[in-house]
Swiss-Prot record:
GO molecular function ontology, one term from the record: structural constituent of ribosome
GO terms classed as biological process: maturation of SSU-rRNA; ribosomal small subunit assembly; translation
Annotated Gene Ontology cellular component terms: cytosolic small ribosomal subunit
Entries under Gene3D superfamilies matching the protein: Nucleic acid-binding proteins
HAMAP family reported for this sequence: Ribosomal_eS28
Domain of life: Archaea
Keyword Thylakoid tagged: no
Any one Pfam family match given in the protein's UniProt record, by short name: Ribosomal_S28e
Protein name in the entry: Small ribosomal subunit protein eS28
Family the UniProt entry places it in: Belongs to the eukaryotic ribosomal protein eS28 family.
Keywords: Ribonucleoprotein, Ribosomal protein
PANTHER family assigned: 40S RIBOSOMAL PROTEIN S28, SMALL RIBOSOMAL SUBUNIT PROTEIN ES28
Organism, as annotated: Nanoarchaeum equitans (strain Kin4-M)
Taxonomic classification: Archaea, Nanobdellota, Candidatus Nanoarchaeia, Nanoarchaeales, Nanoarchaeaceae
Length: 88
C-alpha cells in the first residue's frame, strides 16, 4: 500500500463543510489571448495580492469566463504558464 505523505496538505471535512487548502487572491490585469484546441482557455496576466509573492505579475491559463479586474483564487503562485506562440 502507498504511504500517506504528511507534508502534503489535505482537505478537512467537518460535517457538511469542506475546508480547502490555502489559496491566494490575484487580480486579472491583462487578457493575453485564447489557447487550447478549441480556444476554451484564456491566458491572462494576474497580479498576486497576498502571500509571499504579493505584487508579482505572472501569466496563468484560465478556463471559463474571465475579464480584466476579476479576482482569481490561486492555490499556488510559483508556476507560470508558457507564453502563447502565434503563427505568422
Amino acid at each position: 500500500m502507498a504511504e500517506k505523505r504528511e507534508d502534503i496538505p489535505t482537505n478537512v471535512v467537518k460535517g457538511d463543510t469542506v475546508i480547502w487548502s490555502k489559496a491566494y487572491p490575484a487580480r486579472v490585469v491583462e487578457i493575453v489571448g485564447r489557447t487550447g484546441t478549441t480556444g476554451e482557455v484564456t491566458q491572462v496576466i494576474v497580479e498576486i495580492l497576498e502571500g509571499k509573492d504579493a505584487g508579482r505579475l505572472i501569466r496563468r491559463n484560465v478556463k471559463g469566463p474571465v475579464r480584466v479586474g476579476d479576482i482569481l483564487m490561486l492555490r499556488e503562485t510559483e508556476i507560470e504558464a508558457r507564453p502563447l506562440e502565434y503563427s505568422k
